[in-house]
């Protein structure tokens, strides 16, 4: 049961050529006789594509020093993947990202950083709906709660990579784009939730109306 980072691989591109990529992997289960195994592997990230970077020399310099960009993503409904794979992958990504940013500050005099770390959002989508025990729950609330604890510990580790900058006169501002809550129902309401349509906006645009109760309040 070892998490293995930056496993090299090849992936086909749209033009039919092959691209160098990296994945993260973890062997979750292995039968004693070798007859069966359960292996998790992440999505593939390009190890060579510098097009999203500007100026592009930053990509070349950072990857030479800290390795390739870290694959990230989300898989839900499996406790070991959520807790032992997704979370470990995001922890690895946070360290890589913070190493690159601190390097640019120290070596190239960067004075302003806008850092987006998608861990809390992506992890929340994997476990938020199952934080409340339901008729089809595969895990207890306490087990899923530990996923949330792990998420915020990893986020704290990421923020901690920059706290030394406070002693150098930097100001650190933390923002969240939105919140996620565990639904009360045993089904997705679809309208007004984070996976469906925001009813308020649709009402304002005149594309939908809400049912009313006897007091003429939206239901």
Name each model feature, range by range.
Residues 1-138:
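His/Asp/Glu-rich, glycine-adjacent segments
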Residues 28-31, 102-107, 164-165, 172, ...:
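A general structural signal for short secondary-structure junctions and capping/turn motifs
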Residues 89, 93, 144-147, 151, ...:
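Conserved acidic
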Residues 100, 104, 116, 151-154, ...:
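Generic, well-ordered alpha-helical scaffold segments in large soluble proteins
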Residues 125-165:
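Extended hydrophobic/aromatic segments used for targeting, binding, or gating
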Residues 128-134, 187-201:
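Short secondary-structure boundary/capping segments
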Residues 150-196:
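Metal-dependent active-site segment of extracytoplasmic phospho-/sulfohydrolases and closely related
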Residues 160, 193-219:
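Substrate-binding rim/cap in mid-to-C-terminal beta-strand-loop elements of soluble/periplasmic
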């Amino acid at each position: 049961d070892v998490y293995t980072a930056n496993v090299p691989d090849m992936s086909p591109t749209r033009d039919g050529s092959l691209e160098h990529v990296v994945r993260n992997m973890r062997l979750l289960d292995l039968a004693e006789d070798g007859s069966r195994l359960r292996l998790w592997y992440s999505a593939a990230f390009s190890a060579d594509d510098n097009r999203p970077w500007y100026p592009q020399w930053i990509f070349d310099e950072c990857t030479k020093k800290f390795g390739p960009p870290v694959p990230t993503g989300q898989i839900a409904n499996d406790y070991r993947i959520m807790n032992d794979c997704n979370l470990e992958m995001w922890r690895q990504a946070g360290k890589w990202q913070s190493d690159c940013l601190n390097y640019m500050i120290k070596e190239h005099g960067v004075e302003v950083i806008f850092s987006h770390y998608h861990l809390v959002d992506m992890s929340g989508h994997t476990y938020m709906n199952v934080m409340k025990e339901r008729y089809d729950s595969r895990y207890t609330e306490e087990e899923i709660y530990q996923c949330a604890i792990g998420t915020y510990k990893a986020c704290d580790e990421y923020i901690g990579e920059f706290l030394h900058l406070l002693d150098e006169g930097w100001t650190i501002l933390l923002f969240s784009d939105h919140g996620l809550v565990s639904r009360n129902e045993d089904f997705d309401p679809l309208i007004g939730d984070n996976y469906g349509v925001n009813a308020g906006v649709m009402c304002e645009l005149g594309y939908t109306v809400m049912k009313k109760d006897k007091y003429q309040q939206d239901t």
